[in-house]
Amino acid sequence: MVVVLAVSGISTASDYQQGELVIGQVESGTDVWLDGVQVQVSDTGLYVFGLGRNAAPGVTLATRLNNIRTETPLFVKQRSYLEQKIDGLPSKKVTPNAESTQRIRSDNQQIGEVRQSHSQAHWLGQQWIQPVEGRISGVFGSRRILNGVPKNPHNGVDIAAAEGTNIIAPLAGQVALVHEQMFYTGKTIMLDHGLGVTSVYAHLQHIEVSLGQVVKQGQVLGQVGQTGRATGPHLHWGVTWQKTHLDPLLLVN
């Protein structure tokens, strides 16, 4: 996580990279834009934005206060991502049937509604912690090509751990989604951390929080499982800013 401080102008770090969440502070009443798109600013002047998997090498951060506008180019380090090709799979392993497709659409709609949140209340500004300790079995941004068909990139990280291991909240937030059986992700929780930042926890064995509950950093959310489409016990952990997927490991490292 990189911190950008801006008052009348902008002070920037020099090493941004794809998949990163950027947090900034401006004087109250300042407007902020990223590449011409206005960014939400809290009542205290805190703002955040995300640099996605395919963020361009250069983006422009702009602020305006008292009719004085400042623009600063930010240079974004480009990353390479793992790619795995698997051929000869049965078609049902690559393309879901009509019933499954309908379930997937319903799941995606519910997840999308949570990610549209722009609550002013937020729990940002402190260091994130890892929700569970274990081997990183799946990395952000990797992609599988199944029978020649590119699938969506992996939009989070997978952490392998023993079934039943406690999963804790990496940052305080409000429980925005609790689902007992999503098609791909099984038992799933989403937290709203404010200002468009949300996180998801998937394949859980058991859920210990309820919708609307405010959880503290370090509070138990549930336990590691292998529900949904999982080949072994692990936690899928994802973080987004609005609809932009971010690399969770950059938040804790």
Regions inferred by a protein language model and the residue ranges of each:
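Cleavable N-terminal signal peptides
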Residues: 1, 10-11, 141
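Cationic-aromatic interfacial patches
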Residues: 7-80
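Extracytoplasmic
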Residues: 17-19, 27, 44, 56-58, ...
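Surface-exposed, glycine-biased beta-strand/turn segments
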Residues: 73-185
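Short, well-structured beta-strand-loop connectors
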Residues: 166-177, 209-224
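Zn2+-dependent peptidoglycan hydrolase active-site motif and core
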Residues: 170-205, 233
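Short, conserved catalytic or interaction motifs in soluble domains
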Residues: 180, 206-209, 226-229
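Conserved, short, structured surface segments that act as functional micro-motifs
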Residues: 187-193, 197, 213-253
